[in-house]
Amino acid sequence: MIAASAALLCASAALAQKGETVKIAWLDPLSGLMAAVGTNQLKTYQLIAEDFNKKNTSGVKFEIIGIDNKLSPQETTSALRSAMDQGARYVTQGNGSGPALAIIDALEKHNARNPGKE
């Protein structure tokens, strides 16, 4: 997970303009049975972004937008909309195939409705 997070940050930095803030939506459970796992993962992502922000010289900053999806596909779709409204252009999720499929479906529909704004 840490290697994947670092790769995402590096790839995002390569595409971003100097001074830009890259917003990454983190959609996983922060409540219910998986709350402890989700809380730990979110803190990890935030620490990676914080560390990268301190060390990076490109002027690109990273912000993790953590949203509780309650491990529900429906909540995940709502969380994705909220994250996109907050300016997130990247999304990460790791717990549950139902939420993952909801993200894929929502992004495919969004991209079809908004060509060129993927």
Task: Label the predicted regions.
Residues 16-22:
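Cleaved targeting-peptide boundary
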Residues 25-33:
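Acidic/histidine-rich, surface-exposed loop or edge segments in extracytoplasmic proteins
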Residues 1-3:
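Bacterial N-terminal signal peptides that target proteins for export
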Residues 21, 36-40, 55-118:
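Beta-alpha junction/loop-to-helix N-cap segments that form part of ligand/metal-binding clefts
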Residues 11-13:
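N-terminal signal peptide c-region/cleavage motif recognized by signal peptidases
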